A protein has these predicted regions:
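Charge-dense, helix-prone N-terminal extensions
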Residues: 1-124
Length: 124
């Protein structure tokens, strides 16, 4: 079961990430680009995810993943029930979302330093 504290610990370990409280949501971003957002009740995590892959992700585990809110459908974004995620899955989702908003050289350097295959796709 993942929590806001897990999101915070993972996200703030990623280069250039800053945390911001916007409204009641806790957001993690690089510069002005948000890549993760936790709802005020800490039940939902929104995160960057390729638009063309999100329907398949949601269909694969509908009890865990949800499409973005209608206002966010134009973005590369999807939502998850935070307590349904295990910490390792959360880590992979956040790293993948972060890689979408940082320069490719920074992402590649970080992934290499962590022994993560930059060619892997999605959780798992």
């Amino acid at each position: 079961m993942a929590t806001l504290d897990d999101v915070r610990r993972i996200a703030l370990s990623l280069p250039r990430t800053t945390e911001h409280l916007v409204g009641d949501n806790t957001r993690f971003r690089v510069g002005r680009l948000v890549y993760a957002s936790v709802s005020a009740d800490e039940e939902r995590l929104g995160f960057g995810f390729p638009k063309e892959e999100r329907a398949a992700l949601v269909a694969s585990e509908p009890a865990k993943f949800m499409m973005p809110l209608p206002a966010d459908e134009r973005y590369q974004w999807v939502r998850a029930r935070l307590p349904a995620l295990d910490p390792e899955e959360l880590r992979e989702l956040l790293i993948d979302a972060w890689c979408m908003v940082v320069p490719k050289t920074i992402a590649a350097r970080y992934l290499e330093s962590q022994g993560i295959d930059p060619g892997r796709t999605g959780p798992g």
